[in-house]
Amino acid sequence: MSNIQTGYLNAQDAAALDVELMSTPGFSLEQLMELAGLSVAEAVYEVAFGGDGEKASNDGGRKKRVLLVCGPGNNGGDGLVAARHLAHFGLESTIVYPKQSSKQHFVNLVKQCEDMGIPILQEIPSTNDSSKVEETKYDVIVDAIFGFSFHGTAPREPYATAISQMVQLQKEQSVLLSVDVPSGWDVDGGDLTGTNFHPDVLISLTAPKLSAKKFEGRHFVGGRFLPPSIAEKYGIQKPPYPGVSQVMEL
């Protein structure tokens, strides 16, 4: 881990910053979700091809396979956007989206993924069928279930089961990457409920949340779009993003 300092946001400031982005500089929710999803996709690509050791190593020249588990809110929307970008990047995306939102923007995101030929499932495929081992083998699992609005209670179904299944896939050598906050973690306090959910990689969006101090894996940040005035107001130090990248590893 580097010594790069970015500042941390508590849950209250993270919510306030989101609101301010959609008022003072006039970002739309759709813009922010697109920028966030692109950042997630870049981090996944870096993990799949550049880096988490043997877990994401090349396997006989086949396409890298990514399973994105999406929740009902904006974090899930980030996952949908990421799935589309990953497909454009040449990876094989599969989406698990148990509770699809009826909001038009989310409906549009689903349609865009369908147009890319991305499968959208209701639940994570079972790994118990030995004849389908290759079909359920993923290089990277993306946890895009809950974001910074989650507060410290045990996740409910169907997400509790999904989280357990992601942990199992992680044990079977998939790299587990969480979007913004590991699902089930309190935004400020971390894993307060003892979920035993510990991703290999975290991609913090806009800026790391307080719970990221409890995270011990690879840590990326994606917040290159943040206006300097807002960054200063919330005590965020933007890292020196390389080249044209939207993400940087801390």
Curated annotation (Swiss-Prot):
GTP-binding keyword on record: no
Reactions catalysed according to its record: (6R)-NADHX = (6S)-NADHX; (6R)-NADPHX = (6S)-NADPHX
GO molecular function: metal ion binding; NAD(P)HX epimerase activity; nucleotide binding
UniProt KW keywords: Isomerase, Metal-binding, NAD, NADP, Nucleotide-binding, Potassium
UniProt cross-references to InterPro entries, sorted A to Z: YjeF_N_dom (IPR004443), YjeF_N_dom_sf (IPR036652), YJEFN_prot_NAXE-like (IPR032976)
Binding annotation for K(+): 75, 143, 183
UniProt-listed Enzyme Commission number(s): 5.1.99.6
CC terms in the record's Gene Ontology section: mitochondrion
Cofactor note: Binds 1 potassium ion per subunit.
Top enzyme category: isomerase
Annotated (6S)-NADPHX binding sites: 74-78, 147-154, 159, 180
Pfam families the UniProt entry points to: YjeF_N (PF03853)
Record's keyword annotation contains Lipid biosynthesis: no
Domain YjeF N-terminal: 14-238
Cofactor: K(+)
Function: Catalyzes the epimerization of the S- and R-forms of NAD(P)HX, a damaged form of NAD(P)H that is a result of enzymatic or heat-dependent hydration. This is a prerequisite for the S-specific NAD(P)H-hydrate dehydratase to allow the repair of both epimers of NAD(P)HX.
Protein family: Belongs to the NnrE/AIBP family.
Protein's UniProt name: NAD(P)H-hydrate epimerase
Natural source organism: Thalassiosira pseudonana (Marine diatom)
Lineage: Eukaryota, Sar, Stramenopiles, Ochrophyta, Bacillariophyta
